[in-house]
């Protein structure tokens, strides 16, 4: 039994798979936030500038592209954080697009990190690696995105709506809680702006989140 466990640990180590909070809770989430910031968030900023200053190139050309590429940007960032082989990184672009389409940024995150790890497991294990590795990564990732995505997206939207409604009903206490939580997130290696974007916070809740920054 011990030999089997040792063999399993050695195999996972060889594949660069580390089951730890540091890897999935810090590294992956931090990279996801970077991917989200480099696509959707920066696109939102440029869209606002383009709208206010009447620059159609920013609001009508760059903004739609940046929004559509949010999932792929998140996926590539996560795959690189997990030190995935090139074939897995390239394949994750499709996974990220599907995950974001059906489940938003969180859907892209879950679909990508699971499929990337599976892709790493099969990478270079067969003589037709160029077929097997992308196929495993894409099929598992897109399946996860389409299967789990809608439920994840519904939960995130509902959670965001609950926070905004609660902040409207109890602006002082809920505003304080939201601002404190966002302030705490600022001390972590993830983006507080990305968190607020995932929850679609607006109105009083959005203002409280801004105060927390």
Per-region residue spans from a language model:
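Pore-lining transmembrane helices
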Residues: 2-213
């Amino acid at each position: 039994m011990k030999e089997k466990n040792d063999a399993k640990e050695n195999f996972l180590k060889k594949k660069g798979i580390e089951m730890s909070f540091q890897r999935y809770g810090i590294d992956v989430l931090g990279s996801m936030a970077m991917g989200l910031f480099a696509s959707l968030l920066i696109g939102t900023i440029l869209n606002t500038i383009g709208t206010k200053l009447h620059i159609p190139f920013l609001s009508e050309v760059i903004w739609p592209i940046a929004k559509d590429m949010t999932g792929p940007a998140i996926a590539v960032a996560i795959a690189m954080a997990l030190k995935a082989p090139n074939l897995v990184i390239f394949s994750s672009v499709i996974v990220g697009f599907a995950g974001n389409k059906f489940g938003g940024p969180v859907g892209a995150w879950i679909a990508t990190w699971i499929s990337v790890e599976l892709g790493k497991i099969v990478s270079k294990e067969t003589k037709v690696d160029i077929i097997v590795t992308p196929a495993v990564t894409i099929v598992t990732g897109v399946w996860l995105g389409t299967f789990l995505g809608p439920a994840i997206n519904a939960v995130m939207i509902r959670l965001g709506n609950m926070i905004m409604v609660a902040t409207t009903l109890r602006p002082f206490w809920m505003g304080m809680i939201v601002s404190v939580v966002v302030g705490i997130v600022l001390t972590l290696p993830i983006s507080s702006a990305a968190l607020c974007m995932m929850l679609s916070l607006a109105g009083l809740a959005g203002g409280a989140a801004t105060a927390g920054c």
